[in-house]
Amino acid sequence: LSFEGLPPFGANDRESAQHLQDSLNRAKFLLAFSTSVSPAPYTHPTKEYITGRWTDALASGVTGVGKVPNTTTVREILWDGATIDIDHADARAGLAQVADAAARWTPAQGEQQIRQALQHLDWRHRFVELCKALGEVPTSLTADCEAMRAQYVQR
């Protein structure tokens, strides 16, 4: 196992985002923990939620490892294999779980994460639902979603 830690900050937001993407492109797993077990001053003190850390990782083909937020929404949008819950209270046990997952990892797992993220997390799906509720879905949005579907079917 190797651990990279946080990507470096860039001179501007664009550079920082590129460092993050480069880091995710090298990763197989990303450690992330629900606020229920890892509170921080910049998170909600009582609410659990899935953050951009989880969704960006999944969209990059990376499996989330840690403690997933226990909410109805998270259970609805995530798929089997999107995340691996590990023992957050015992670092040795948690690392053993990560080592086991790393030993079983295949490139197909990363491809599956990307495919599933396109199907479940892409905002265009939500825009379609909003537009339907308003009575009309723009043809460009429909075309985008059809192209996306073709992409995740072909992967």
Where are these regions (language model features)?
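Pocket-edge positions in alpha/beta enzyme catalytic cores
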Residues: 12, 49, 86-87, 118
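A short acidic/histidine/glycine-rich donor-binding loop in glycosyltransferase catalytic cores
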Residues: 79-87
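A short acidic, often aromatic-flanked loop/helix-cap motif at beta-alpha or helix-coil junctions
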Residues: 9-13, 89-94
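Nucleotide-sugar donor-binding catalytic core of glycosyltransferases
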Residues: 1-78, 123-126, 137-140
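Active-site proximal loops enriched in glycine and acidic residues that flank catalytic Cys/His/Asp
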Residues: 68, 87-88
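C-terminal amphipathic helix plus adjacent low-complexity
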Residues: 84, 92-155
